[in-house]
């Protein structure tokens, strides 16, 4: 209770305890509270008593006459008498009746008068005070204070009829009159439907149902604005739209029945005022609110009033919460009438952004271009898939405004350096003053003034620049694109010259790591260029390929190279080894376990990875090893760029590049379509590749369903590696070994003879480049490891690896290099 006491009321209680000590009493009674009220001197109670000729001296005399003096021994903690406790309870009740959420001296005085049987009442009678007129005097004085502090508008007078509601809610109508609400654009149909339901005789309670961020609360604000503008039917004129904070209503209810008491008071106030429309955002929070230890929850307390039409309530909640909480309670559900609030279209969102533009321009102190607003709606719809319009578009313009303002408010680099120097000079000057080195301090003072003058000059020159500060900074389409790119990782910004050159030279860049396989490199490069320029189909993935061919020719390596050069790093690639998905039940690993199974809350590996990183390469390695049911899952990804996970969320694959590798047809490729064992001319090689490709396609058709193959953009058959290509790959592998051993400060070289030996042992058309890797490990890495461990090669050496005439690999140092013959 005491937390609601004003400072003056607390002072009265302290003075009452002092009076008890003065008279030697071990209790605080009504008479001590009266003496405290008189002694406080500045509160409303003291002023009222003073106007009735009550002073502290006379009051003390009367109290002493009635109760006398005590024993003299007084405890540290002085308890209240039962009558004094009753006075405190009555003062709380008086405060509530007057609609005050505090207890002041005036309430304590009215509590004393209302109690009427204590020593205080007898003291007042003895002092010839008209006790019956005290309450009227207090209320009159309270009224004068209120008139001095509050303007007497109709809205304020009406609001004072509902003090409890005012404490636990916000008056949207008043905020609309004062211009404190954002303008509501569109939504006329939904607002009309809400007005229609509010006009009913009974069960006049609409509930706004929609996804998060579509503008449910805005509809309630739109209704408040229409009432403020008197643009409503006569049945709703002069109504007050008040939003109730359920959390605040529950907060601080320590004792049983306190929550119910608050809610009943609110309902009584609404019933007596007869002009309140209650708005409860997140209306599902009513269910269970305040229901502790068998108490009745808020929803059950409100049910009778909602059904009889005594309470007009607008609820707002999401589809999921409505289904989970309100539909489970048919008795509550029948009292509400759903108004479905759909997500606005991109065009409607642009109109909403134009309506809100002034508010955001004023807040950020800049200008927002028409193109920026249109881009915000378009990009939000296209690239941010897990949220809803117009909320995500509004967030884009808000953050873009913040970014542009911050960029324009920063000092130039030269001024920032000077500012840093100024702080150092001030610190040194203060140290010199503390050390009483006043001459040194004077020198630093001169430097301080010099730096301040330089900073002022730079700021002035920036202000005088013609194109920068004559007008407010402008938020452009590029700024919106920067924010989208920062949120999602998808490059939406316009192409820079360096990036354009990088994309044009993409094949050359990939060929630095991938030897041969021109068809695959060209197909992947074209897909990336198409997506980056914005010419790809916005409703499909960037591209989808099957890389088919023999083992070890660079199918997975090409995907790694692509992820490394154009998506940040190899780690940014989402890699799924399909040999892990050979059983039917492993489908759940991709999209998440169904409800009731272990791991439901964790989500699927594929869907969660794409939600976190929507712009990436997805590699389905060894696709033919997967269970056939996996391919059914891929159909909607390949066609529509979307997949629904176990929780019902739609995951967007429209900015992913899908690559599947397969060894299907490797037997056909190994046979090479005939002419095996003979050196082929270029024309023969090309015709052989064409024949092999058609045979591989036939094999794929036998293994995969037509609807799966038909959704792929391209099936690329990798060629077998030629001896020259294996030689180039050998150079790459040797360079990797050189780089690794250079970290130990050893400069390694190999002879041409060793390279030829490496190619001879590592070349196998059927197995690609993997035998070469084994040859490097056996011939080079093993020999080097033995020499390093034996101590023959140490840091700083420059060994050379060669092959003797007998075919033995030798690691030679400086003095033995003459053996190289």
Curated annotation (Swiss-Prot):
SMART domains: AAA, ClpB_D2-small. GO terms for molecular function: ATP binding; ATP hydrolysis activity. Residues 80-144 are annotated as: Repeat 2. It is found in: Plastid, Chloroplast. Pfam families: AAA, AAA_2, AAA_lid_9, Clp_N, ClpB_D2-small. Coiled coil: none annotated. Residues 2-144 form the Clp R domain. This is ATP-dependent Clp protease ATP-binding subunit ClpA homolog. It comes from Porphyra purpurea. The gene is clpC.
């Amino acid at each position: 209770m005491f937390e609601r006491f004003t400072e003056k009321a607390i002072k009265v209680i302290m003075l009452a305890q002092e009076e008890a000590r003065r008279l030697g009493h071990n209790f605080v009674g009504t008479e001590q509270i009266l003496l405290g009220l008189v002694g406080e001197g500045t509160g409303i109670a003291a002023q009222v008593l003073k106007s009735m000729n009550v002073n502290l001296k006379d009051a003390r005399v009367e109290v002493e006459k009635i109760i006398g003096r005590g024993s003299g021994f007084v405890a540290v903690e002085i308890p209240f008498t039962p009558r004094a406790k009753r006075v405190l309870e009555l003062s709380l009740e008086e405060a509530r009746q007057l609609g005050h959420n505090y207890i002041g001296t005036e309430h304590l005085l009215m509590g004393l008068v209302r109690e009427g049987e204590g020593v205080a009442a007898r003291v007042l009678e003895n002092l010839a005070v008209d006790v019956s007129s005290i309450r009227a005097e207090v209320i009159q004085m309270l009224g004068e204070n209120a008139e001095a502090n509050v303007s007497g508008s109709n809205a304020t007078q009406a609001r004072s009829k509902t003090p409890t509601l005012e404490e636990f809610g916000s008056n949207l109508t008043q905020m609309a009159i004062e211009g404190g609400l954002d303008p509501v654009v569109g939504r006329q149909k939904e607002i009309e439907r809400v007005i229609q339901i509010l006009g009913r005789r009974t069960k006049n309670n609409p509930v706004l149902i929609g996804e998060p961020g579509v503008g449910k609360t805005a509809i309630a604000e739109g209704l408040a604005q229409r009432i403020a503008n008197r643009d409503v039917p006569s049945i709703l004129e002069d109504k007050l739209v008040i939003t109730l904070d359920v959390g605040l209503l529950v907060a601080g209810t320590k004792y049983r029945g306190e929550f119910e008491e608050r809610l009943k008071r609110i309902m009584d106030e609404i019933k007596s005022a007869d002009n309140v429309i209650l708005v409860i955002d997140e209306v599902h929070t009513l269910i269970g609110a305040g229901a502790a230890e068998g108490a009745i929850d808020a929803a059950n307390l409100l049910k009778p009033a909602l059904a009889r039409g005594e309470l007009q309530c607008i609820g707002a909640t999401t589809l999921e919460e409505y289904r989970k909480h309100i539909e489970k309670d048919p008795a509550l559900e029948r009292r509400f009438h759903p108004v479905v609030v759909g997500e606005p279209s991109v065009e409607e969102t642009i109109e909403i952004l134009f309506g809100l533009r002034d508010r955001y321009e004023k807040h950020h102190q800049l200008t927002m271009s028409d193109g920026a607003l249109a881009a915000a709606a378009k990009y939000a719809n296209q690239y941010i898939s897990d949220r809803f319009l117009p909320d995500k578009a509004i967030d884009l313009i808000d953050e873009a405004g913040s970014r542009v303002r911050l960029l324009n408010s920063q000092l130039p680099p030269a001024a920032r350096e000077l500012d840093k120097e100024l702080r150092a000079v001030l610190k040194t000057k203060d140290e010199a003053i503390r050390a009483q080195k006043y001459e040194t301090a004077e020198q630093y003072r001169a430097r301080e003034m010099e730096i301040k003058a330089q900073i002022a000059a730079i700021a002035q020159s920036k202000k005088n620049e013609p194109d920068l500060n004559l007008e407010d900074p402008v938020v452009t389409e590029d700024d919106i694109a920067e924010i989208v790119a920062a949120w999602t990782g998808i490059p939406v910004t316009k192409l820079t010259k360096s990036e354009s050159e990088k994309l044009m030279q993409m094949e050359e860049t990939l060929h630095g790591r991938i030897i041969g396989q021109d068809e695959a490199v060209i197909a992947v490069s074209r897909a990336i260029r198409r997506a980056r320029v914005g010419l790809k189909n916005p409703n499909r993935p960037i591209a989808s390929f099957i890389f088919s061919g023999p083992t070890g020719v660079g199918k997975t390596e090409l995907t790694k190279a692509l992820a490394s050069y154009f998506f940040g790093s190899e780690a940014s690639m989402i890699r799924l080894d399909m040999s892990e998905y050979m059983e039917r039940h492993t489908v759940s690993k991709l999209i998440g376990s169904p409800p009731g199974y272990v791991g439901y809350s964790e989500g699927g590996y594929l869907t969660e990875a794409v939600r976190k990183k929507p712009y990436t390469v997805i590699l389905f390695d060894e696709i033919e090893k997967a269970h056939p049911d996996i391919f059914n899952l891929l159909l909607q990804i390949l066609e529509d760029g979307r997949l629904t996970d176990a929780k019902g969320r739609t995951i967007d694959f429209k900015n992913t590049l899908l690559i599947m590798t397969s060894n299907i047809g490797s037997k056909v490729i190994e046979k090479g379509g005939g002419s095996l064992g003979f050196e082929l001319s270029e024309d023969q090689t090309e015709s052989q590749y064409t024949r092999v490709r058609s045979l591989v396609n036939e094999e794929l058709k036998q293994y995969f369903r037509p609807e799966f193959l038909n959704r792929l953009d391209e099936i690329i058959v990798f060629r077998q590696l030629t001896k020259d290509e294996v030689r180039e790959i050998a150079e790459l592998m040797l360079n990797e070994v050189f780089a690794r051993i250079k970290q130990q400060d050893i400069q390694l070289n190999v002879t041409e003879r060793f390279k030829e030996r490496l190619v001879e042992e590592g070349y196998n058309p059927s197995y690609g480049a993997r035998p070469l890797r084994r040859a490097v490990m056996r011939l080079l890495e093993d020999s080097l490891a033995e020499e390093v461990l034996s101590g023959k090669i140490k840091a700083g050496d420059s060994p050379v690896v060669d092959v003797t005439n007998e075919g033995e690999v030798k690691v030679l140092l400086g003095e033995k290099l003459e053996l190289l013959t």
